[in-house]
Amino acid sequence: MDLLSCTVNDAEIFSLVKKEVLSLNTNDYTTAISLSNRLKINKKKINQQLYKLQKEDTVKMVPSNPPKWFKNYNCDNGEKHDSKLEQKNHIPNHIFSDTVPYKKIINWKDKNPCIVLNEYCQFTCRDWSIDITTSGKSHCPMFTATVIISGIKFKPAIGNTKREAKYNASKITMDEILDSVIIKF
C-alpha cells in the first residue's frame, strides 16, 4: 500500500493525475504504471482517474499492453471535439510503436494487407474497421476506403472496386504502421 493512497482522497488524486496528463508534451504519452511510480499512488486508483478523464475528453487512450494515455490536443484550445476519430497525422508516432516478433513480420510478407492488418490488430488487441464510400456515376463508381484502428483514421485509398480500395487502404496503413513498430529478434 502506498503512503499517499491512505491520505489522499479521490478528488485530490484526480487533480494530480489531470495535472500530470495536461503537462505532457505533444509527442509524449504516459501509462498508469509510470504515473503510479511518479505520484507514489496505487495503480488501480490512477487507472480509475484516467478513465474519468477519458469520459471528460481530457485524455485519449490507445489500447495496448499497457494502455497508452495521451493528452487530447483539443484541450489546449479549450474546445471540445465531438468526433471520436482522429486523423493519423495528429497522433504521436509512438502510439503504433508496438514490439512485433521478426517471424511474424516475415510471415506477413506475402500475405494480403487486409489479412496482415487483421492479424496485427489481433496481436496488439486493437479494434479496427474499414470505412468505404462511393463516389462518381452509378455506371462507373469510384470507391474510397479508409482504415480506422482504435478510433484513429489513416490515409484513404481509391479503387475501382470495393476490394481494390480495401486492399490499397490496408497496404498504405500497414506500410505506415510497420515503419513505426519495433522488431523483436
Curated annotation (Swiss-Prot):
The keyword Membrane does not apply. Gene3D superfamilies: 3.30.160.20, Winged helix-like DNA-binding domain superfamily/Winged helix DNA-binding domain. The keyword RNA-binding applies. Residues 112-179 form the DRBM domain. Keywords: Host-virus interaction, Inhibition of host innate immune response by virus, Inhibition of host interferon signaling pathway by virus, Inhibition of host IRF3 by virus, Inhibition of host IRF7 by virus, Inhibition of host PKR by virus, Inhibition of host RLR pathway by virus, Interferon antiviral system evasion, Modulation of host cell apoptosis by virus, RNA-binding, Viral immunoevasion. Residues 7-73 form the Z-binding domain. SMART domains: DSRM. One of its GO terms (molecular function) is RNA binding. InterPro entries: dsRBD_dom (IPR014720), E3L (IPR009179), WH-like_DNA-bd_sf (IPR036388), WH_DNA-bd_sf (IPR036390), Z_dom (IPR042371). One of its GO terms (biological process) is symbiont-mediated suppression of host cytoplasmic pattern recognition receptor signaling pathway via inhibition of IRF3 activity. Pfam families: dsrm (PF00035), z-alpha (PF02295). It comes from the Viruses. The Z-binding domain recognizes and binds Z-nucleic acid structures. RNA-binding protein that plays a role in the inhibition of multiple cellular antiviral responses activated by double-stranded RNA (dsRNA), such as inhibition of PKR activation, necroptosis, and IFN-mediated antiviral activities. Recognizes and binds Z-RNA structures via its Z-binding domain and dsRNA via its DRBM domain: RNA-binding activity is required to escape host ZBP1-dependent necroptosis. Belongs to the poxviridae E3 protein family. This is Protein E3 homolog. It comes from Yaba-like disease virus (YLDV).
